[in-house]
Amino acid sequence: MITSSVDTTTESPKKGRRIRYSGSYPKDFKDRYKEMRGDIDTINKVLAKGSTPAGTHVPIMLGEVLDHLGLNFTREGTRKMKNCLAVDCTLGFGGHSTEIIKVLTTLKNWKHYGIDQDAVEIVKTKERVISAITTANPDTDTNLVTRRISFHNQNFGETEELAKTEGFLGRVDAIMADLGYSSMQIDDPKRGFTFKAQGPLDMRMDPTSGETAFEYLSRVDRKELVRILEENSDEVMSLQIAECLKEEPIPTTTTELSERVRKTVKFTALRNANEIPTKEALDSAVARTMQAIRIEVNGEFRVLEKLLDALPRLLSPGGRVVFLTFHSGIEQLTR
């Protein structure tokens, strides 16, 4: 008798080899920031190191913001409130607004206005904020929440005009603004805010209107470019950088701008001090250059001055304001 047997065991699929890169680290944006793919283990590793994963947003100084706005009701000495009207002038990812609204929902009457000029991101943030509020408290009346949260796609320099239209002039109890670009803007190379990946030289916070960074560089003269590099970013090599950026053809991408600035700073440092700048020094020079141009493209000082001028007319008696900024010039303005 001949018998036969069938092997029913199955081979485990072979594990793919780790992707190799030509250098020590991946150069491509999507490979370098793997956490943007949503892998929870990778995200947790980034968080464990004390960093913020690309593609996410952790609202900075949240406790301090609530304290200074007088909205930390668990803290002894915080003002007693039954009603509150709050305005977030820079909605962004919605992190600060979400936590502020969670506090507001404990009050009898409240209203929250979220303002952002980014027409692309405000739609996503609206869904994100409402979802976060209703998820945090399943008993929340969703219809009530959506009626009491108002989203507005506009520049915060127009907050007074919004207050007149909506009827809250002189009634704002809490205003906050987290100044500068948002995490979503820098995470998307196509917006032109980062030099870590190639993208168009855009830098507009509202991508639907206004001139791009490329258009600004094309029309501005060298003298004016030197001025904005000095005033907006305290750039010590403003003259050399302005000259290199005005050479034809004008750079059209973030990486082209970055390479020009790096070569110029390296050459100037070698000529003047006979030393080669570190990578960190070159990165900082590029970041300062892009910051100076971004501030000008978006009129950041001008719109802030307009908001500051409107504050006495916006705030209720005892109303409070919080500004978050990492820019010394903007800090001086707000003080």
Which positions does each model-derived feature cover?
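S-adenosyl-L-methionine-dependent methyltransferase catalytic core, i.e., the SAM/SAH-binding region
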Residues: 1-335
